[in-house]
Amino acid sequence: MGGNPLRSYGRGVAWVALALLLALLVAAPLRAADRARLEAFLEVTGFGVALDSIALSASGAPEMLGLSASDFGQGWSTLAEEVFDTGRMREMGLSILEQALDDEMLGHAAEFYASDLGQRLVAVENAAHLHEDDDAKRAEGEALLAAMPQERVEVLRAMNAAVDSAGTGVRAVQEIQVRFLLAASYAGVLESEIDEGMLRALLAEGEDELRESLRASALASAAYTYQSLPIEDLRAYVAALEHPTMARVYELMNAVQYEIMANRFEVLAARMRGLTPAQEL
């Protein structure tokens, strides 16, 4: 049969590497979480790329202050890259997982994501995570949804519900906003200090609107991300995500992502003061 022998060789190497990662993950018990096994976990599940993609969220920081990146001058890009350093964020993620990820969770997730289906999912998820133009991605996702059979739409909805089975997304986004805005206020980035109680009350008023916005955004993102996969694969993914152990894994991974994002936004706010005069919120 035809085909590029170099590409075939590359696929063989990739599967050998994957087999070694899986062997490392399941070979030994997780005591105080072996760092090498956790690093393998980041790779086989794609969670490492998900952590790296947090850096792309830095572009939203000025908007939360009613400003744009250009308001912070030429130093903005350098500052954002320093604060959202991917190596630092992976280290933070590993430190949290080291304390919270147990044997059952690690083994269960690793076994699924090392499967043929799991690796197809990781491939498309990694590609979507690293796509920098969120507006273009959402527009394409919405266009796909408009022409999509309702049956597939419902499977994507079920998938998104399973990814955040604890329903923490809205509260997490609110907490990130609170921590960032308070840090910006304390650092003098804003002209006047923010009252935390008033800020939380204001965010609570918009909670329903935020929930719908996040739901619509997640659905468009799923339509874009999984467009190349058949509905049978998506149904199998939903079943895997709904397993109680996988639900625990995702609850932890979501918490890790949210904590790292909130922490980095706090650090960013503290360092933004040197880039611009005080601004009103």
What spans do the regions from the language model cover?
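N-terminal secretory signal peptides that target proteins for export/translocation
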Residues: 1-11
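Immediate post-signal-peptide N-terminus of mature secreted/exported proteins
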Residues: 33-64, 153-168, 172-175
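A cross-kingdom marker for long, charged
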Residues: 211-281
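Bacterial N-terminal signal peptides
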Residues: 15-25
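Extended amphipathic alpha-helical interaction segments
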Residues: 130-227
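N-terminal, post-signal-peptide region of Sec/Tat-exported proteins
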Residues: 52-89
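Sec/Tat signal peptide C-region and signal peptidase I cleavage site
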Residues: 28-32
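Acidic/His-rich structured neighborhood in mature extracellular/periplasmic domains
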Residues: 79, 83-174
